[in-house]
């Protein structure tokens, strides 16, 4: 069982690429085969990296970007169906708290589709750049659900 937990951690971390260039930390959603759909583990990895950057004096800004042709398809529905963590200690809330409380410039470089959380997370960014062909959508609104 421990090896499964270790694999889950390292597999998730591999879906979030981290690169520091000078004083800028770039976090890249790197799951293009799934349109960068975000899993619980990816949320936790993002939260951890953003929280670390908040207290690192060598990092002056964070850029969130993506690989492939989509920024993100939103939440990975299969992952959330199998493990629906939604309390304040959940990875999703950890991520939202991290970006909401981040004391330095938070920048998003968006291309392709930004679905669900891919759109709502942008409201917490200080600057958002988007390609001209970027499509923003919040499908949960058509169900009468608004998370904000």
Describe the function of each predicted region.
Residues 4-67, 97:
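Conserved CoA-thioester-binding segment of acyl-CoA-metabolizing enzymes
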Residues 58, 65-101, 114, 144:
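Glycine- (often His-adjacent) and acidic-residue-rich active-site loop
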Residues 27, 64, 76, 121-123:
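Hydrophobic/aromatic residues within transmembrane alpha-helices
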Residues 42-46, 91, 121:
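Hydrophobic alpha-helical membrane-association signature
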Residues 95-101, 109, 115-148:
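CoA-thioester-processing core
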